[in-house]
């Protein structure tokens, strides 16, 4: 663990630059399987799926996740920000003229709304966590969703390998942050602790899209060659 490493090496700890691997949360927008869920009614399933298809809801979740707190569960508070990445394609992966890929992407984000103005996509800092933006986006989403007959709170099933204690702590951190920022009367994160085999089968190693048994999942990808299309 980071705590033991720090105790042993103290002032000799240095941090390398991040590699081409990117980690991110993704939504299951068309869930078909419910073998691992806390939902008890079809109404809850329908409400969750309708919410996930709502752009403002997804953005509320994005702005409501404290990625630094999540990372701290595995890397310690001092090293937490060192692992953070804000784009699927690493921001310095390629150049576009005299600007990095991240700089060009950031300049285009404002076209999607003023909430994206001034976003810094550089590595090693959280570009998105913002309580006010999360709450504002959720308020918009709730108004739209209630008009569609959606009932609250929205339950999101999030799977995790129960043998990976750091991952379990990380998901519990996400649960605490989102339910605090958005209100547990609005959203409930149901952390599904699964065996290693079950976790693989419903997530990264799922044989087909229909087997992906979750609403929100933490996943990753690493590029194979030096072009953004590899992501």
Where are these regions (language model features)?
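Flexible loop/turn segments at secondary-structure boundaries
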Residues: 23, 33-34, 70-71, 79-80, ...
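Short helix-loop capping/hinge motifs at secondary-structure junctions, enriched
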Residues: 31-57
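Periplasmic binding protein-like
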Residues: 8-13, 180-231
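Solvent-exposed coil/turn segments that connect beta secondary-structure elements
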Residues: 19, 30-32, 66, 77, ...
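Extracellular/periplasmic catalytic domains that process cell-envelope and extracellular macromolecules
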Residues: 7-8, 18-20, 54, 149-152, ...
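Extracellular/periplasmic solute-recognition and catalytic clefts
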Residues: 1-38, 68, 72-74
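Append "and occasionally in soluble cytosolic enzymes with long acidic Gly/Pro-rich linkers
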Residues: 51-181
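Structural recognition of the beta-strand scaffold that forms the well-ordered cores
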Residues: 14-16, 23-28, 60-64, 71-72, ...
